[in-house]
Amino acid sequence: MKKIFSIVLVIMAVVSPLRAEIETTVGADVVSEYIFRGVKCGDAALQPTLAISAGGFEASAWGSVGIVNHLDTKELDLTLSYSLAGASIGVTDYWFSAGADPYGRYFKYKGDATNHIFEAFAGYDFGFASISWYTNFYGNDFKVDGSKAFSSYCELAAPFSALGAEWTAALGFVPMESPLYGTDGFAVTNISLTAAKSIEITESFSLPVSAGLTVNPSSEMAYLILGISF
């Protein structure tokens, strides 16, 4: 009994600080267009976020639903990640209402008949710049011949402050053939510059807004996106 009591005390000593550090994040963005890594995924959308983090670990849920075009694909992403001293790793489960399963069932995970895509990622933030690599390893990601595509994406990003706003410049590329990104080999799909700032509405309330210019050299498309955060 004494040993059991000692073990319980040790567990409580470890868990209590972790409980004190648990943080919950709730928010939402409204965007004029849904652009993902240089690829258009839909028109204006509402994108809510729910995240819980503690001790470098984070579990999050992120969604997107069209608010103008009812034909836009709905999306629900679940991510589990760990960050330590600038380094981060994680896995994301992307689910789309359209895909290999014509019924759009969430709990259908069979590889060749699912609307899920599982992606692993790793990155490092140097402070003045960051680099991230993402690779799909399971789900609805196939080449035209039916083989697995293992679609991958790499992004370099650099934040800076200027002209009363917080800016981020980014360059992203796809290293190999990927129908998901619309490439048949190495291609730059994302060159973007985004500015974010808070607009004061009243003395006690400010509205965070962002505007970003994104160019996709691979698809020869360009987008100007407005975002509002809550």
What is the predicted function of each stretch?
Residues 193, 199, 219-230:
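Outer-membrane beta-barrel "beta-signal"
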Residues 38-43, 71-77, 100-109, 140-148, ...:
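Outer-membrane beta-barrel translocator domains and adjoining extracellular loop/strand segments
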Residues 108-179:
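Detector for outer-membrane/organellar transmembrane beta-barrel domains
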Residues 57-83, 88-112:
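Surface-exposed loop and membrane-interface regions of Gram-negative outer-membrane beta-barrel proteins
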Residues 19-23, 86, 90, 159-168, ...:
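Short loop/turn motifs that connect adjacent beta-strands in outer-membrane beta-barrel proteins
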Residues 1-23:
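Cleavable N-terminal export/targeting peptides
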Residues 22, 42-46, 72-76, 83, ...:
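Residues that define the transmembrane beta-barrel architecture of outer-membrane proteins
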Residues 25-31, 51, 60-64, 81, ...:
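Transmembrane beta-strands of outer-membrane beta-barrel proteins
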